[in-house]
């Protein structure tokens, strides 16, 4: 989901990023065109995802490019709410735009004068070898869907509020202990003991 001003200028839509979602949409098109050859029904396709996959399913529910490619959806432990989708160009308070993050990423690897051609020359091994870098406070926000006016005209939250969602059966829910491996403090008994009998209210306020 890397966006960058130079990538946007190369696009006839004047946008960049969301390549992961576009790959998912291309895969759904292939399934719809070919599933009958495997005994499936192209008019009864269900998509399902858990955690990041649940977020992907929820985002596909609002993309106009995925309309008609599936008929039912299941999302577990991943809604994409409230601010997973980043605006492509506009910085909003602490939420840095996708293109700004792309520029920071280029500078991180290649210095102040880095351009998109330099980035294309980077070995893949070098990129994946620094999975612990943080250009912003929240690393998760570096690799998520982008409100670009094309793949995603608006955020997931706004799309559901405005009812700009595919009209089809949609099952949502959460699995027990989802995400606790990423946030061990939440399930550490010492954390509960700090708050005494008020731990439910206090912990809820803390994690929010």
For each predicted feature, which ranges?
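Serine-hydrolase-like catalytic core of hydrolytic proteins
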Residues: 1-113, 150, 159-186
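Substrate-gating cap/lid region and adjacent catalytic-acid/histidine neighborhood
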Residues: 72, 85-87, 118-208
